């Protein structure tokens, strides 16, 4: 399990991502996985947590996904494990999933958020 995977680890690189972009599901994913991972890290004596996040996460409160990322970051900051949060720019290889999440038949709802490659 997770305890065995972290045995002897000094650093955890957390690139976890939710399999769903639905507001409640993505929040549940980041809160549950974050708490579970951080508790296991503390028990294993991990000395640093590196988490991948997204530039502008804190400015996109209309998005359930980004609210969940803010919650994930808050859990990391509140933990006893020293951390780095790396906010990278958008990953445009996910654009199809983002568009499909806003599609309903022949209608696509676009986010009002400004993003660029």
Model-derived regions, located:
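NAD(P)H-binding glycine-rich loop region in Rossmannoid oxidoreductase-like domains
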Residues: 1-44, 55-61
